[in-house]
């Protein structure tokens, strides 16, 4: 459970959704693969961006045992909460942040994912399909 949930009021928001009868699941490492099954059935997945690329609107996710990547990949809709403090200009600055954290001995996730909007794919006939390899809709919310 990400401590930022409470910092940004998501804990209370989730409780209000549950009171209305909405199923809410917070990633729980103890559940293992069951988290993925739940994410696959979910309508919405919400994560915090660790680093956000202003140039492309790319969200950077640090995924590990306690914070799975399927949250941003499997639900039909993905919502990224972007703290303003995570904004950098482009990928070169993002990799610098990761490199500097590693140099300082700070833990860096075992998987770093870069997410830029909903999944798009087109075949040879140029028929665009949205959501083939991920969510159909993506929303970004910038917070102080």
Stretches found by the model and what they are:
Residues 1-144:
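The feature marks the mature, well-folded catalytic cores of soluble enzymes
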